[in-house]
Amino acid sequence: MSRFFATGSDSESESSLSGDEILPKPVGGTFGKQPIILSDDEEDTKRVVRSAKDKRFEELTNLIKTIRNAMKIRDMTKCLEEFEQLGKAFIKAKNIVDKEGVPRFYIRLLSDLEDYLNELWEDKEGKKKMNKNNAKALSTLRQKLRKYNRDFEAPIAAYKQNPEESADEDQEKDEDSEASSSSDDDSDEGMSASKFLKKADSAPPESRSKFLKKEEAEDEESSSDDEDWGSDSDESDSDESDDENKYTSMASRFLKKTVNEGDRQAAEKKKEEKAKKKQHRKVKRKDEEGEEEEDDNEGGGEWEKVKGGVPLVKEKPKMFAKGTEITPPIVVKKLNEILQARGKKGTDRAAQIDLLHLLAGIAEENNLGQGIAVKIKFNIVASLYDYNTNLATYMKADMWKKCLDSIHDLLDILFANSNMFIGEHISEDSENLSNTDQPLRVRGCILTLIERMDEEFTKIMQNTDPHSQEYVDNLKDEARVCEVIERAQKYLQEKGSTEEVCRVYLRRIMHTYYKFDYKAHQRQLSTGQESKSEQDQAENEAEDSAILMDRLCKYIYAKDRTDRIRTCAILCHIYHHALHNRWFQARDLMLMSHLQDNIQHADPPVQILYNRTMVQLGICAFRQGMIRDAHNALLDIQSSGRAKELLGQGLLMRTMQERNQEQEKIEKRRQIPFHMHINLELLECVYLVSAMLLEIPYMAAHEFDARRRMISKQFHHQLRVGERQPLLGPPESMREHVVAASKAMKMGDWKTCKNFIINEKMNGKVWDLFPEAERVRSMLIRKIQEESLRTYLFTYSSVYDSIRMGILGDMFQLEIPTVHSIISKMIINEELMASLDQPTQTVVMHGTEPSSLQNTALQLAEKLGNLVENNERIFDHKQGSYGGYFNRGDRGDRDQKDQYQRKEGGYMRRGYRRDQQGQSNY
């Protein structure tokens, strides 16, 4: 018999269950009233009427749980999906939220999720490890959350100020615990009270800490809830006994309940009382803890509050036992013990450096000699270099300062002790650290320390923001670095080998070649204006950088046995010549070295140095007015479109997919520090202006030449981009200025061309960056006038029968000898079919230039000839005859026409006839 139909006490129900009773048969047919028989599943469930608020909030909390789980495993795709669902669920609960207010747990999630996404976004290494879907979802979710949180700025700010749980959440947790306890009571009816209590005590509180995540304050609250759990269970027992008295039969308990307004108010009142009791218990517990502390204080000494995180003052480790005699062998043995831990896993590198400093102090206190001091200093500097195991990690400021100071101290000791010899060839067994009767011998290489120090300085500059004050402060250390290198150079010149001297010379060159010597430049400009005594004083102040570079490089040319050091020295020497406008010396050195023939076999840093040298050579040629040489020097770098990468000044984003992380790290280590960069906008402007001065006259001379070649593809590309624009406004960028100037030069309008190239905006961007800006501007104006004259003559020569050179000089503001020289060159090179009448200073045109109609007819005839030739070849191929079009009998007519053109001059223009005869034997 089902126990739900049994009435009476618990003992009666148990006795009825023990016996086998027979159910009475119902009276009537099969369609009569059947007794209500519930299944086992229905026995364990309870129908409860839930409010809309509970349903909506439960939906929100379930979604929040899913989001937090996804946050733990860094599943951004799942986070994004659930966040979108959460937004939809919140919109559904809008009516309830308007009445009750935004729930605290919802604000907590928005705040936590925002902090979590910001932390992920700043973690660059973690972002690189994400797959594509997660990275995309992270970016999308971050944007959506920032936009979504604008509506909740005030609640989120209030929550961040006081992230404690609100009373509403406590009430919600009490409701959940009450509901769970009541459901357990109903399902376990018929059991003994002792069994029920045991089950209630052992049951885990499922609803407790429902919304708690990570905060320490909330963890404390959860612990206090654990302490109060017993009292909550007692309250649930009393509520359960009250519920049992309400129902007269078991079946009535499981029928749907109708809740009236009075019952609801009573339930709310009961919840408030529970919350008050809970708060009272917390206050009481705190008071009891305070009393216990007072009792402890009365019984013993006073307790003192100590702030967490205060570092304990550690005693310095004892290097030697008390009473030990400090001798050089003992110190060397201790030094070897410290060095044995070097490089091992788990070794505290900072502590190791401190131990070495402490050992150096002990050796100095006991006057153990300079040999021991030098050996310890060598190991201190080496330990500073080994502090960062990762090659890409740069040295911190305090470590860098210690490194410089240690190297300075080491050099001081070496200069003070002339009887000391150091070198890598000295073995540890043959070292002499303390016997002053013989020369001191220490194993070590000062040059290796200097080179590593220079590399560390480069890494520091590479990893510092170039637009910050920190970069300027770090750059000031270069003076100390150069001082260390200069002192090492003096020491190695006395005691070093030729190979070591070449290496230290190269370090000195690398810190000198890219710097413009303003003092030498000023002395050069003021030569003849100063008295002889002032000149002698200026020469004695400091060695001219040109003399220094010449002396260092020539020593390397003569003594070096490795190709790499000699190649770097030659390139730096050329760069320095070009930087100081010594064009011919730089050009001759480049041509004599033949570096352009085998530079592709050099390592990448040397190739970067070669590219920088060629660029500086081209800029120097431009400043000197050698436009064609400047264009040729810059052509390879600019035509590739990768000038930034080839010069070692950054990586291109479009090539980032072609390299993995290791290759990217290697290429970043090859980058040149910012203070050594070449201005890329200046470089491009110099190249485009050079191309304009060469290309525009050439285009005018070969306007109707179908086979004309392009001097600069990049310049033509810029022209096409300018022509494709539907609406042309005033030029803004540097490229637009050059394109506008080119169009003006095509028309022979040199003044407009000059105004586009030389104006206030272009001066600020480009021309003022040159040391002698005014001289460069005057050179540019002169070149624009000359090339505009050539372009004008090419374009309008068919219009004139003759023209006076005085008129041309007035048009382009050139002297008559200059105009005469330009026109004479054009006639000699067969670019202009004309002759000069010296008495009248007139240019007489020969009139052999074809008109536009004749040029069109020539082009049509040429295209028809090509068409006929192609048709004849196709016909011969189909017929099986391979004699070709050139073997046919009608060739004599064309030969006669070509002979006429050769003898009479014909109507072919300028040098086009000669080019045609050389390219095809028609």
Swiss-Prot record:
Cellular localization per UniProt: Cytoplasm
Q: Where is this region: Disordered?
A: 1-37, 154-308, 885-922
Q: Name one GO biological process term.
A: formation of cytoplasmic translation initiation complex
What Pfam families does this protein's entry cite? eIF-3c_N, PCI
Q: Domain PCI, which positions?
A: 674-850
Q: How does it assemble?
A: Component of the eukaryotic translation initiation factor 3 (eIF-3) complex, which is composed of 13 subunits: eif3a, eif3b, eif3c, eif3d, eif3e, eif3f, eif3g, eif3h, eif3i, eif3j, eif3k, eif3l and eif3m.
Family label: Belongs to the eIF-3 subunit C family.
Name of the protein in question: Eukaryotic translation initiation factor 3 subunit C
